Amino acid sequence: MTERNIHVQPASGLAVEDQDIEVVERKGIGHPDTICDGIAETVSRALAQTYIDRFGTVLHYNTDETQLVAGTAAPAYGGGEVLEPIYILVVGRATKKFDGERIPAESIALRAARDYLDEQFPHLDLGSDVIVDVQFGEGSGDLQTVFGEEAAIPMANDTSYGVGHAPLTETEQIVRNTEQKLTGEYAESNPVVGQDVKVMGKREGDHIDVTVAVAMVDEHVPDLDAYKTAVSDVRAFVTDLAEEYTDRDVTVHVNTADDYDAESIYLTTTGTSAEQGDDGSVGRGNRANGLITPNRPMSMEATSGKNPVNHIGKIYNLLSTEIAQSVANEVDGIRQVQMRLLSQIGSPIDEPHVADATVVTEDGVAVGDVEADIQATIDDELADVTDITRQVIEGDLSTF
């Protein structure tokens, strides 16, 4: 094993699964903040791949300041209309000229952003419901980093940190899978469900409350009774889904702000609240593992859109999560591991200033019994840090 600064220590408190109160949130792919995350990351991958294809290197860029300004809509039973379009501004920096060649960075970004919206949002008319704009400052050619050269370890661009944890608790699994399956397989056969699905899980002792906000699509809602049926169907689906992950009691609540007497309901024309007064920004929603987990250490860094070569705010959050998963899967006797990686600007990213694992072990297993195995697993993952860059560019790792 190398001389990397790796620490392993026992956690001072209970595993999250054993705490009295647990809160978990996920903002779905159609939430305005997550729309920004998705576009920023898609544009990031497109730029990185273009640079590799043309120059064999990932040049300097960042797209992690993407913003969304909500539109205005008039939803109605059977189908309403968008009155003022959603405005999306892809903001950042990109290298537009390198080695004597000009690079159409803005055009690449615009195409990637529109392709993402077209793929993810079937109820959004790209011709009239949304405006996509791109504003890139010039990146620095001096900050280029060669990607793909064996033994080339990038230097950290910042003194910053990333965090990750494993395994997911029952509540975390329920929350993440509820959104992913509602906006995935369920929405495919039930198009009344829009892409803006927000899920909040609260576990109090052995009872889990799952509160789901679902943007219903007005085109598929002819009247209030049909809306009520759609809400009831979602509730039943999520209840059955939750039972796959827990034996605890689960209560599912759907669109709790509805007032049926006043016919004030969560009805949308496009399937996202971005059509009506809900703005968005990169990094204000899900962390790198797709969840918001106030019971856990979290980084405030926006992971999506950052350069995947040496930007610590991206790499260390993704790597911390991968390390935690590897430790939980490969080392016997681990009940919970929470990982922190701290960089120092200018140092190789495979040599963090400190790599710290805080561990809860199973009954009868002391941390000292497994410390060497944990350190070895962390060391192996750090040695392979550049694989995070490859996975991100190829789209194998999600950042939101």
UniProtKB/Swiss-Prot annotation:
Classify the source by domain of life: Archaea
Q: Which organism is it from?
A: Haloarcula marismortui (strain ATCC 43049 / DSM 3752 / JCM 8966 / VKM B-1809)
An example GO biological process term is: S-adenosylmethionine biosynthetic process
- Stated role: Catalyzes the formation of S-adenosylmethionine from methionine and ATP.
Extract the InterPro entries matched here.
AdoMet_synthase_2_family (IPR027790), AdoMet_synthase_3 (IPR042544), S-AdoMet_synthetase_arc (IPR002795)
Q: GO: which molecular function terms?
A: ATP binding; magnesium ion binding; methionine adenosyltransferase activity
Please provide the record's keywords in A-Z order: ATP-binding, Magnesium, Nucleotide-binding, One-carbon metabolism, Transferase
Q: Where does ATP bind?
A: G137, E138, G139, S140, G141, D142
EC class, as a word, reads transferase
Name the gene for this chain.
Answer: mat
Q: Give the EC number(s) under which this enzyme is classified.
A: 2.5.1.6
Check the record and name the Gene3D superfamilies matching this protein.
Answer: 3.30.300.10, S-adenosylmethionine synthetase, C-terminal domain
For this protein's source organism, the top of the classification is:
Archaea, Methanobacteriati, Methanobacteriota, Stenosarchaea group, Halobacteria
Cofactor or coenzyme needed: Mg(2+)
Q: Does the keyword Signal apply?
A: no
Q: In which pathway does it act?
A: Amino-acid biosynthesis; S-adenosyl-L-methionine biosynthesis; S-adenosyl-L-methionine from L-methionine: step 1/1
Q: Catalytic activity, per the record?
A: L-methionine + ATP + H2O = S-adenosyl-L-methionine + phosphate + diphosphate
Q: Which family does it belong to?
A: Belongs to the AdoMet synthase 2 family.
Protein's name according to its UniProt entry: S-adenosylmethionine synthase
